């Protein structure tokens, strides 16, 4: 399980990159607009992990959308947490769903979804989607904007 810290102790500090998600600390800060229903989006266009079988690198575009409640994620801690997967062997589905579940455990958002758009290995892209359920009524929810992978042409 990822470690949780209230506040922004990593922001503005020289912090060593965690070697694994278990060593990473996701930080949360109070939502200054807790009464408002809004969407926050984080996009990680260069997410990497390792294939658990071959040890070869896997690459993905991650799009994380969430409707905050009492907490918002501190972005530097999220960046370091996502980077901690770089040396972790895990299947695409495991990485994508785990990130979503870890964020839910830390933030307890009104709603969250994650799209993992994995680049092809072996000629086949894998897209993984996970959410906490239906979005709240009235939430402006733009498309994640990632077309299906089709290679050249």
Curated annotation (Swiss-Prot):
The active site is at residues 51, 58. Residues 1-26 are annotated as: Disordered. Its EC number is 1.7.1.13. Keywords: Cytoplasm, NADP, Oxidoreductase, Queuosine biosynthesis. Signal peptide: none annotated. Substrate binds at residues 73-75, 92-93. One of its GO terms (cellular component) is cytoplasm. It is found in: Cytoplasm. Pathway: tRNA modification; tRNA-queuosine biosynthesis. Catalyzes the NADPH-dependent reduction of 7-cyano-7-deazaguanine (preQ0) to 7-aminomethyl-7-deazaguanine (preQ1). Belongs to the GTP cyclohydrolase I family. QueF type 1 subfamily. NCBIfam families: QueF-II. This is NADPH-dependent 7-cyano-7-deazaguanine reductase. It comes from Methylocella silvestris (strain DSM 15510 / CIP 108128 / LMG 27833 / NCIMB 13906 / BL2). The lineage of its organism: Bacteria, Pseudomonadati, Pseudomonadota, Alphaproteobacteria, Hyphomicrobiales. The gene is queF.
């Amino acid at each position: 399980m990822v470690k949780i810290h209230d506040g922004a102790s990593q922001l503005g500090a020289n912090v060593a990159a965690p070697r694994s998600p278990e060593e990473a600390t996701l930080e949360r800060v109070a939502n200054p607009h807790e009464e408002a229903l809004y969407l926050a989006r984080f996009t990680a266009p260069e997410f990497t992990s390792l294939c658990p079988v071959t040890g070869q690198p896997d690459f993905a575009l991650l799009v994380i959308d969430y409707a905050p409640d009492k907490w918002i994620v501190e972005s530097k801690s999220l960046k370091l947490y996502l980077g901690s997967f770089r040396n972790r062997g895990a299947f695409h589905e495991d990485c994508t769903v785990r990130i979503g579940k870890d964020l839910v455990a830390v933030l307890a958002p009104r709603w969250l979804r994650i799209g993992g758009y994995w680049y092809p290995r072996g000629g086949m892209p894998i897209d993984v989607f996970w959410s906490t359920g239906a979005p709240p009524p009235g939430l402006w929810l733009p498309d994640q904007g990632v077309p299906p992978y089709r290679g050249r042409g």
